[in-house]
Amino acid sequence: MMDYQTAVRGAFFDIAGVAETPDEVAAQARYLDDGLLFLRDGKIIALLPWQEGEAFLHPLKGYVDLRGKLLLPGFVDTHIHYPQTEMIGAFGEQLLEWLTTYTFPVESQFADAEYAQEIAQFFVNQLISHGTTTALVFCTLHPASVEALFSEALRLNMRLIAGKVMMDRHVPDYLCETAGESYEQTRALIRRWHQRGRLGYAITPRFAPTSTPGLLEAVQRLRAEFPDTWLQTHLSENREEIAWVKQLWPEHARYLDVYHHYQLTGERSVFAHGIHLDDAEWQCLHDTGSAVAFCPTSNLFLGSGLFRLPACWQHQVRMGIGSDVGAGTTFSMLRTLGEAYKVGQLQSYRLRASEAFYHATLGGARALRLEEKIGNFQPGKEADFVVIDPAVTPLQRLRIGRCHDIYEQLFVLMTLGDERNISETWVNGERVWCQD
């Protein structure tokens, strides 16, 4: 008998290993139309075909029967702003005006700990109800915003990485701090929360225009003090932003050079957007082991530009998918992948379903340097997964019924699917959400 606590039966799809090309992704794709997943202590013991796994079932334990559903590794969102949840879908501005008009006033509310807790609870529920089990999250500059989010994620034993925004210029006075204050508050939060449960801390300078040299030096010191933390910031999202960086940092030839000068590139650094990078910047990301977060709904909504998917493969840069709520228009990774496909089509790049779901699962985990812990159904991985009902609307039932293989089904899910298709979400081996 296998020493397991829970067994789950259903159809399973994952990418069994990391890949360096889209063809390698396709070669590592694994599909079981009737499989059995064995779990113990929040970890995966084995995924076996039903015919093989049935022999290991304990007669008194049985199994969770999810036949008719498709089980995928939990989605990984590599860039999202939880304080912006309430302002999703704000009309009419591009990046810099959008920050001033909408974002900064909304973020000011998170000085109130009770308000932060209310939004944190709503935000985490949105993540899990959309099948996202791991996220890299921006908070606000208020420590209370970080405390609220980590407290809620800890309650569910989620794998979540987040950090207090750091910014000391070109923001309203009510959101401005000194470099010293930012350093001390961030240091205290790291000591309190980093590696507590499944949580991780991300040092979070908002972006170069809201950072003085002194602030980036403080970030550099924190990186040296706490080398196993993450770093997240924004990079080359908008042409006007890039011109502003050039004006503020004329001594640096390129936007990424500002971060690289302060040693903020590296294996646990994730740069959101990267739409307008040149080849030298792509090469720097590769050489330093840095990652990028591709945020298609946000890039389209703000009119920022089209991310170059092939450049990630060409330069061998790790990449994950980001919803980027609230400039992003959905928490749904299914809908986000559909928009990613359209971004590719506009550049004559065909994003296959296998590649898309790789970026949303194991590829995203790899961008966060978590590929040894999450991202597929390999033995020893943490048991984070999402249960998909592939046909919840009349149109989906018609279309899915005419699919010839799992790849066509996955493509239909990323073009017609949304949160209605999320039947259950499991975190660390426990069901934490299901449809009413």
Predicted regions and their residues:
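C-terminal cap of metal-dependent C-N hydrolases
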Residues: 24-25, 382-436
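His/Asp/Glu-enriched, well-ordered alpha-helical/loop segment
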Residues: 261-268, 309-398
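Alpha-helical scaffold segments that flank or form the walls of functional sites
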Residues: 88-158, 182-195
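N-terminal metal-binding scaffold of metallo-dependent hydrolase/deaminase domains
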Residues: 1-58, 67-70
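Metal-coordinating catalytic core of metallo-dependent amide/deamination hydrolases
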Residues: 144-274
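Divalent metal-coordination and catalytic microenvironments
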Residues: 37, 42, 68, 79, ...
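Active-site gating loops and adjacent loop-to-helix segments of metal-dependent hydrolytic enzymes
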Residues: 86-118, 164, 168-179, 238-266, ...
